[in-house]
């Protein structure tokens, strides 16, 4: 993985931002860190890294002496919490030092990522698309848009998107749909999440599913040499979510603890109150609560995920980066051509997620250990979601940010920062 990252930096050497050079030279002058350049670093890394044996890596442990060790614990401060004493910590450390621990033996799943695929799908049509893209239509109905760019050499981004999302489910199942991405904790195909991480060692590739209000999607990225692996992972995301009850139970417990810690933050109560008022207590606008975790039934989560990714022909695929339509075509017919397809195409449903109408002034009081005040102003109005309007909103946001920084912070000293944000959101009416 290290050599792969070095190679990626070398391939993108002509696209490095000025800030990266500045940071490197600052470290060079202040910390005497060498700055030989990526050409030298790549050559040196490929010469040195293969010569470092595992034994040499393990010898690093000998550099950690028993004396001069520092231990730090970060624990929540709350009533009823039992904290370890200094002696208990030292005793636990001594017990570990005295143990005879067997060397770790790594088990690797050497099975192929996907089974042998024999697709009869062909390229039905390849034509020029919009904005310089190539539109490839497969004989199974899947459409693929390919755009070659040189902005980031050796990098490829993928997105597959389909209409539907959580809008097709009732409010009572919103949290289930919103967390259906949790299925990836079990891994894909024949590989657990841990085994898959080992299998992908040395590769720069990722594919992750998501389910939003009106869409479901896959988001992928890779370097050029790992394009086929990205398509293999895409195939698994559609066909083979893996069930792992222990991993899912552990994830729910971590989620539950994280939400409990959030509940202890006074700002969380403020955010919950604001969301409730602004969106008329719409469950789709509220965050998941600790008590909601118990309702995330694994069977139903798996079922919903499979429903959303059951028909690949309902998705449009986009590949952007260091990739050509002609070179990717054989991989598309092999992997996307092997996906389950149907003639039915879904549409998202209209779900009322609009902000409350009218002017409201709300004041929330909550006792805090460190008293502070927060003022939040929210404005909304109907406006066309066009490119021009999005640019204008961005310009307005940046201008107001500069204005408030100069007046409220620098001139008045009234606040450290006054964040400003703005966006346009589509709310389909049919």
Segments from the language model and where they lie:
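Peptidyl-prolyl cis-trans isomerase
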Residues: 52-60, 242-243, 248, 296
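Feature representing long, continuous alpha-helical segments
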Residues: 55, 177, 390, 394, ...
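Conserved short beta-strand edge segments in small beta-sheet-based binding/regulatory domains
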Residues: 244-250, 342-346
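Conserved alpha/beta enzyme-core scaffolds, especially Rossmann-like or related mixed alpha/beta domains
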Residues: 308-310
């Amino acid at each position: 993985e290290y050599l792969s990252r070095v190679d990626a930096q070398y391939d993108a050497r002509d696209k490095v931002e000025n800030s990266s050079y500045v940071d490197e030279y600052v470290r060079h002058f202040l910390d005497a860190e060498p700055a030989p350049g990526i050409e030298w670093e790549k050559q040196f890394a490929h010469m040195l890294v293969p010569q470092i044996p595992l034994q040499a890596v393990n010898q690093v442990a000998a550099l950690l002496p028993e004396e001069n060790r520092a231990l730090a614990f970060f624990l929540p401060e709350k009533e009823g919490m039992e904290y370890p004493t200094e002696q208990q910590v030292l005793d636990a450390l001594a017990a570990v030092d005295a143990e005879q621990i067997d060397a770790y033996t790594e088990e690797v799943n050497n099975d192929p990522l996907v089974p042998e695929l024999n697709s009869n799908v062909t390229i039905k049509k390849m034509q020029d698309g919009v904005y310089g893209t190539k539109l490839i239509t497969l004989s199974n109905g899947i459409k693929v848009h390919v755009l070659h760019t040189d902005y980031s050499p050796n990098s490829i981004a993928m997105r597959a998107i389909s209409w539907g999302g959580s809008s097709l489910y009732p409010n009572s199942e919103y949290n289930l749909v919103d967390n259906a991405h949790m299925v990836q904790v079990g891994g894909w195909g024949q590989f657990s999440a841990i085994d898959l991480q080992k299998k992908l060692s040395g590769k720069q590739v990722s594919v992750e599913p998501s389910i939003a209000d009106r869409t479901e999607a896959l988001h992928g990225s890779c370097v050029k040499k790992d394009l086929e692996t990205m398509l293999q992972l895409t195939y698994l995301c559609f066909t083979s979510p893996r069930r792992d009850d222990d991993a899912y139970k552990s994830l729910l417990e971590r989620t539950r603890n994280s939400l409990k810690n959030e509940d202890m933050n006074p700002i969380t109560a403020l955010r919950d109150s604001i969301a409730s008022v602004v969106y008329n207590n719409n469950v789709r606008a509220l965050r998941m609560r600790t008590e909601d975790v118990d309702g995330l039934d694994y069977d139903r989560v798996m079922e919903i995920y499979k429903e959303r990714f059951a028909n690949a022909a309902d998705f449009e695929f986009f590949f952007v980066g260091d990739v050509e339509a002609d070179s990717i075509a054989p991989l598309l017919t092999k992997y996307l051509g092997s996906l389950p397809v149907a003639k039915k195409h879904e549409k998202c449903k209209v779900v009322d997620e609009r902000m409350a109408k009218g002017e409201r002034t709300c004041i929330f009081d909550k006792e805090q250990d460190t008293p502070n005040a927060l003022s939040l102003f929210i404005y909304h109005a109907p406006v066309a979601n066009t490119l021009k309007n999005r640019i204008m909103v961005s310009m307005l946001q940046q201008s107001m940010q500069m204005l408030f920084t100069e007046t409220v912070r620098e001139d008045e000293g009234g606040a450290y920062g006054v964040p400003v944000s703005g966006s346009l959101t589509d709310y389909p009416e049919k």
